[in-house]
């Protein structure tokens, strides 16, 4: 199993490298066929593992980047090789500290950061982006524009569907979006030392639950949870003798027309009850503070289409060159970073998209 995963890892440049044309896809096609890239991750895992619990444990990784293990290409099984070779890292201070350090780096480089200014429009002229217009109607001109907004939102709303390339029109029209996320953040006034930093809590169903989430867009009574306890590694996430957690639950995106104002409070109770009955005794009594995010929050705060948690799903037809390109096909000075472009979602994927941009921009400098 791990040998085959490592073989997929040898095609890592296809997944993370610079994609200026479709050539890498075609160059690697014989290898992809040989590695049975047409199989799903679950099919690949099932070739080697027979017990249903093991199949679940070794096939859930696509969910961490927004994909259904039953239709995500088995190329993504390379995640096993990546984690086995380099391990799993956690930044002291969490993702917020990564953002803080990037902000400090930008300031050291003389980059001016403007906050609380929503971009309403990208102004274009022929084959160039002239600048942006904010919510106050102010125009700002730029030589190059890098957008980390969702590419579909960038194209359909900020630029306008009639002013984008044919490739982006097809990506937008045919897009299969990732699932939504329900995230419950909570602190406890006691420590749960038995809980590891990362825990995956599996519900009674697997394939049928994923079908409810990805295909039927219905909110089921059962669920699975990724439980994150950063205090296991960084005690500064909570006061002394306290703990900090978030419980992340895959749910349907907003194509499901779920009334989250009604469902969210009930969903919170269900999550707490499930954890309390299995691994966190008296949890309801120990929670001292909590809040949650639903797909509605992702839509309103991050402008992600349908409130999806990871932009578009990592299907084969939405991977590498088939995603929105890092360099726009029509506008010579417009570039994309983030979960919706190449290589994809997750902190490693997003940071790799920035590395791709770092290599691309010099190719198009005046």
Which stretches of residues belong to each language-model region?
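C-terminal segments that line or cap access tunnels to active or ligand-binding sites in enzymes
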Residues: 189-299
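Rossmann-like flavin
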Residues: 19-71
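Mid-domain catalytic core of redox enzymes
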Residues: 120-239
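Single conserved hydrophobic/aromatic residue that forms the stacking wall/gate
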Residues: 1-21
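Helical element adjacent to the flavin cofactor pocket in flavoenzyme catalytic cores
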Residues: 78-129
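A glycine-rich dinucleotide-binding beta-alpha-beta segment and adjacent secondary-structure elements
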Residues: 51-65, 220-228, 281-343
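A conserved FAD-binding loop/helix module that cradles the flavin
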Residues: 339-361
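Active-site-proximal substrate-binding core of FAD-dependent oxidoreductases
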Residues: 124, 363-366
